[in-house]
Structures are given as structure tokens and as C-alpha cells.
Amino acid sequence: MDAAGGDQLSLAAVRDALVRLEDSVVFALIERARHPRNAPAYAPAATAGEHSLVEFFVREAEALNAKAGHYQKPEDVPFFPQDLPSPLFPTKPSPKVLHPFASLVTVNDAIWKMYFDELLPLFTVDGDDGSYAQTVALDLACLQVLSQRIHIGKYVAEVKFKDAPQEYSRLIKEKDSNSLMDMLTFKAVEEKVKKRVEKKARTFGQNVTLDDNATAGDSECKVDPKVLSKLYDQWVMPLTKDVEVEYLLRRLD
């Protein structure tokens, strides 16, 4: 995410990025929902060192992305950071608006587990169409956009810290995670976000026809809109706040 105005982090830029990523999350899930669960894509294979196809694909894709210069921004966090290659091409430095340790703050392990254990069964049907390579490519797209959305919490935390540095500094020095979480939580805003992503899923996921009288219920949407609301309520926003708290606890280091 680029800060607006040079090295000054803009609250408006952070909000705009979060809203834009809502669209990306909805579309990523819609694309993945075109295929059934395809369980063999997640089974360990002896020919791949006991890795599953999805793990192999993500590792290889991240290595290629790293060579091209990806993962240079704090919100772009790899799922398998061990031994990633260095970029082979010049990259433009991002404005230094966060604490230097920001790139080390990650909840990708929790995102991975949530996606495969909890979320995927909610919006895909049980079945096997054999399209395993395409399936894991779409899984990667979902994982990447969810990870980026959640790790933008680093910027949210920095903006909030600068808005009330004395209050946050006191809690940080006391290592009071619970009070930090309370300060970062705005229930009214979270309710608006849940309603907005649900509406986007209903709008983007409808099957468009030329029949002006056609009305589609949620059951006819490509992804149940309530799944998006649940995704943000139970996982995206809580994990984002986990990122914010972890970032803030080290903000004064």
C-alpha cells in the first residue's frame, strides 16, 4: 500500500485500500467457488516430498514472485518465507511510514488454517472435477488477498498510534494487550463493514439475465453473501486487530 503524500501515512489512503480489497476478496471467492472442493489437491503426495499440491504450488509461486520483486512491502507477507530468493530485478523502494520491524509481523499461519479448515467448506460444494492445478491457483489468489487485507492492519495501527500517541504508549509500556484491543475496536464501524461486504457479494455474485422481472435470492448467488459477512466478522477483522496489537506492542522498540 502506498501512502498518500510522500512519507506521510494517510488515513484516507488506508481506508480506500481496505474498501478496494473488499472487492478483491469477494471476486476471489467467487472464482474459487466455480470449482468443487477437490480434496485430492490437499492430500500429501510422496512424489512431492509429502507436500500437498497446494503447498507445493504456493511455495513455487512465492519463490517466483520473490524473484520478480514481490514481498518488498509490509502488507505483502509470504506464507513460506524460509529461503525465499532475492529479487532479480530493481524494485522501487516504498515510503518508510512504518516501524522497521513491521515486515516481521505476520498471522499467515492462522490465515492458512482458517482458509482450509473453516472457510473453504463454507463456500465450495463437496466434489471432485479433476481441475486440481486451477483449483490451487485460485486458492492462492484467495490466500494472497486475505493476507494482504489483514496485514494492512499494520498501517491502521500506525495511523491510530499517531492519532493518540500518549494513550497508546502507556498501554504499550504496560504490555496491556486487552486494553489495546479495546481501543482498536469500533463495533459500529465493524457492523458497517459486514453489511457492505455482504451487499457486495450479493451484487457481484448475481447471475445477470435480460429478464427485467428476474429476482435472485441469496441461494442463487455464486457465493452466499452471508459467508462474506461471517468471514469478516469471525476472521478478517479479528485477525486484523491481532496484527494491530502485535505491531503496537513493538512500536516503541
Swiss-Prot record:
Gene3D superfamilies in the record, alphabetically? Answer: Chorismate mutase, AroQ class superfamily, eukaryotic
Protein keywords: Amino-acid biosynthesis, Aromatic amino acid biosynthesis, Cytoplasm, Isomerase
Give GO cellular component annotations, separated by semicolons: cytoplasm; cytosol
Q: Which reaction does it catalyse?
A: chorismate = prephenate
Localization (cell): Cytoplasm, Cytosol
InterPro entries for the chain: Chorismate_II_sf (IPR036263), Chorismate_mutase_AroQ_euk (IPR008238), CM_AroQ_sf_eucaryotic (IPR037039), CM_II_prokaryot (IPR002701)
UniProt activity-regulation remark: No allosteric regulation.
- Please state every residue range assigned to the domain named Chorismate mutase: 2-253
Which PANTHER family does the record cross-reference, listed alphabetically? CHORISMATE MUTASE
Which protein is depicted? Chorismate mutase 2, cytosolic
